[in-house]
Amino acid sequence: MIEYKHVALRYTDKNILKDVNLHIEDGEFMVLVGPSGSGKTTMIKMINRLLEPTDGNIYMDEKRIKDYDERELRLSTGYVLQAIALFPNLTVAENIALIPEMKGWTKEQIASKTDELLDKVGLPAAEYAKRKPSELSGGEQQRIGIVRAIIGKPKILLMDEPFSALDAISRKQLQRVLLQSFK
């Protein structure tokens, strides 16, 4: 469960968010819709403490977000950015392995799950695992970003325009993969 209680964010004299109250139950999908600059990305960044509210509190499972250890919080949160943030010096497989490695998975577990998820998103591991991000299209990079976010089975998945670089067919395929991953 995630809950925003009277959350606000101000930069100097400008209110970015004002008195936001929101309740999201476990297992619930929630979409923030609004015009550019309305605070959607800001709200997402607050959940994993990339930004801190100036007023109010955000809770996860009835505990204030700011009371969580940042590493613990971020390991339990998958995050897909609109601007894909793959490490350029790492291969696709190495990018995907980051969270599982931090969680103590074995190399075999990581390789098996990486191969499975790459295949599910239409990027066969035999063909893509050893590539660098510079060798991928924007849509392929976006799919890798989604695989990296879901491989560790996060409690919360935050997505900021995750399908913007994808065609309609790839978008539908990824939506199915995401729904199956969180059943």
Could you describe each region identified by the protein language model?
Residues 93-101, 111, 115:
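Short helical segment in ABC ATPase nucleotide-binding domains corresponding to the A-loop/adjacent helical element
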Residues 108-127, 177-180:
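Conserved ABC ATPase "signature" region
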Residues 152:
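Conserved signature/switch motifs of ABC ATPase nucleotide-binding domains
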Residues 157-160:
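Catalytic Walker B motif of ABC-type/P-loop ATPase nucleotide-binding domains
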Residues 33-35:
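The feature captures the beta-strand-to-loop junction immediately N-terminal to the Walker
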Residues 56-64, 73:
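Conserved ABC transporter NBD signature motif
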Residues 48:
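Helix-to-loop junction immediately C-terminal to a conserved catalytic motif
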Residues 131-136, 140:
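Conserved ABC ATPase signature
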